[in-house]
A protein has these predicted regions:
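Single conserved hydrophobic/aromatic residue that forms the stacking wall/gate
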Residues: 1-8, 12, 263-264
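Short loop/turn elements that form and flank the Walker-type P-loop nucleotide-binding site
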Residues: 5, 215-217, 244-245
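Walker A/P-loop
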Residues: 217-235
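Conserved SF1/SF2 helicase motif Ia
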Residues: 237-260
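Charged, low-complexity
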Residues: 18-22, 26, 37-219
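Generic detector of well-ordered alpha-helical packing
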Residues: 4, 17, 225-226
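Generic recognition of well-ordered alpha-helical segments
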Residues: 205-208, 236, 262
């Protein structure tokens, strides 16, 4: 609705013409009180992201609550927890009915800008949620039912880097411990070792790192320079592991067979 008193000056008249032109482009009548047919759901997104910006550039815009209700920015709560060798990521959409959550996640993973609910509301995904989706796709996460997604625990560091500090994200205690141990292997508890040799600090760190990876079911490669004691670190690690499991497959050059044969638990 335009204020008729604004037609008193040439400046306002020129402004009115701009407003009328914008109204016509948006499907309204060029009148002081203008109407247009109801927006279809697929048109709501364009109306709010493009048409409304044009109106705002011309003056103050007030939007009724009923119209605002058709367009909502969706920032779901995200919960991450460990499930065995996997990470489970749950999405809780506040404005989406439970029966539509899987369709909303599909729209998010297909990089759509918005999702249209059965009630006709246009739900726009916020930028942070879209970044999370892109990361999960790169990690080849698998969509399940009920807003759940699973991926390997190896993704813990990437997810922590992206999601740390976001108010809508919660981590289980198990996930927090996993991410911390991956970042701080030097603080992992050193197991009881059955070796007579005294390990240097960096060798002890290597054993802690191997032990931490083994604890979470990961694998790793010691890549020190030659002569820094990779064989000793491996033997020390195996003395701890073989107390719990009597089986270990060792592939080694023939020059190391004697050293490895001295492992006794």
């Amino acid at each position: 609705t335009l204020d008729r008193s604004s037609a008193a000056s040439d400046v306002y008249k020129r402004q009115e013409q701009k407003v009328f032109q914008t109204l016509l482009q948006a499907g309204f009548e060029a009148e002081f009180e203008s109407r247009r047919p109801a927006l279809l759901p697929q048109d709501v997104y364009t109306f709010f992201t493009h048409t409304m910006e044009k109106f705002r550039s011309l003056g103050r815009v007030e939007i009724s609550p009923s119209l605002l209700a058709l367009y909502q920015v969706e920032k779901p709560k995200i919960a991450i927890e460990t499930k065995g060798s996997l990470l489970e990521i749950g999405f809780d959409f506040a404005n989406i009915a439970p029966a539509e959550v899987d369709d909303a996640l599909s729209a998010l993973f297909e990089s759509r800008e918005y999702f249209v609910s059965q009630s006709g509301k246009v739900l726009v995904f916020d930028e942070e949620t879209k970044r999370v989706s892109q990361t999960l796709q790169k990690l080849r996460a698998k969509k399940l039912k009920g807003g759940q997604i699973r991926t390997s625990r190896l993704a813990a560091l990437q997810l922590t880097d992206i999601l740390e500090g976001q108010e809508n994200v919660s981590f289980s205690e198990g996930f927090r411990q996993l991410a911390y141990d991956l970042r701080h292997p030097e603080e992992f508890q050193l197991p009881s070792l059955q070796v007579e040799a005294e390990l240097r600090d960096y060798q002890e760190l290597g054993v802690k790192w191997l032990s931490m990876l083994n604890h979470y079911g990961f694998g790793g490669i010691l890549a020190d320079d030659m002569g820094l004691g990779k064989t000793l670190q491996t033997i020390a690690f195996l003395t701890a592991v073989l107390r719990e499991s009597k089986n270990a497959l060792i592939l080694a050059p023939s020059s190391l067979v004697y050293n490895l044969s001295l492992i006794h638990i």
